[in-house]
Amino acid sequence: MKKLHHLAAAACVVTLGLGLAACSSSSSSTTTTTTNTAASGSAVAHVACPNGTLTFGVEPYDNASVLIPAYQALSTDLGKALGCKVNLQVAESYVAEILAMKNGKLDMGEFGPAGFVFASQQAGAVPLASFADSNGQLSTYTAGIWVKKGSPVTSLKQLAGHTLALSSTGSTSGDWVPRYALIQAGVQNKVKTEYAGGHPESLEALLHGKVDAAEINSQTEASAEKAGTFNPSQYTEIWKSQPIPNDPITASGTMSPAGQTAIKNALLHLNASAFTSGKTSIASELDFTPPASGQVMIPVTTAMYGQLFALAKALSLTTSNL
């Protein structure tokens, strides 16, 4: 488990690393894969990627070794639709992705709902689309706090005096939402929180008995069940959040309106295979079931994530914390 932090320090995301994960080469600052297309001279490519390349960042909600193949089909199909190269990058941290867009290193990015709050305020990220559920509505997920079955801890208040693994600072379901729940329960200063370094690591901390409780969101739960590494019948979920809107895919605020529109239209018309193909897929990673027919991605607006902006205000988090 990575360095532990007391709950009081969680509000300051400034402590996060500012780099991007490097896997493709020792000198690279990103985990990157490039999709080439033959139609780079199209009018769409001219407005969406005038330099011939579109850089697409993804938040590190799972390991890069999992996310790169999961997002490869989307990157490939998006590149074909736009007629340009798409460089796929998995950020090293939530803040790293925000700063990459702020510093002109990303043209578009998928942010977690909490990350989008800061990306909107700090980097001018413009929401384009998100993932639809089987009914064609914006898909959602939940945060949860789990304990081993038979644990004397059965509620948030009873967490006082116990250890709790959260995922990483800046995570919506792994930090902001459960931390606010502890505040509402009046035990925020009585629980020893440990930032495990990610959603899988938070789950592992509970599985290996390193903590008394752990935040496990519905997406991680589903992925771990599918992989056979988590049996929910042996654990108890003592708290569950209200539904959280799924990640928006955004464009940099410095991109031309025409470019933003071109990318949005391309996303809205991608085939379902872009989200469901492969051993690991976006749909399985984000735990949503796409519509049987129709658009897999639907338009989203900043207003749809208003609850996260309100939560940031309630926790006194601003872009100055970056």
Residue positions per predicted region:
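A bilobed periplasmic-binding-protein/Venus flytrap-type ligand-binding module shared by bacterial periplasmic
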Residues: 142-153, 244-258
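C-terminal motif of bacterial Sec signal peptides marking the signal peptidase cleavage site
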Residues: 18-22
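An extracytoplasmic/periplasmic, membrane-proximal ligand-sensing/linker region
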Residues: 44-57, 62-69, 73, 251, ...
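Acidic, polar ligand-binding/catalytic clefts
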Residues: 99-158
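Beta->alpha turn/N-cap motifs
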Residues: 58-60, 90-94, 104-123, 130-132, ...
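Bacterial signal peptide processing site
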Residues: 24-27
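Short beta-strand->loop
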Residues: 126-138, 192, 226-243
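Bilobed "Venus flytrap"/periplasmic-binding protein-like clamshell domains
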Residues: 55-79, 91, 114, 138-204, ...
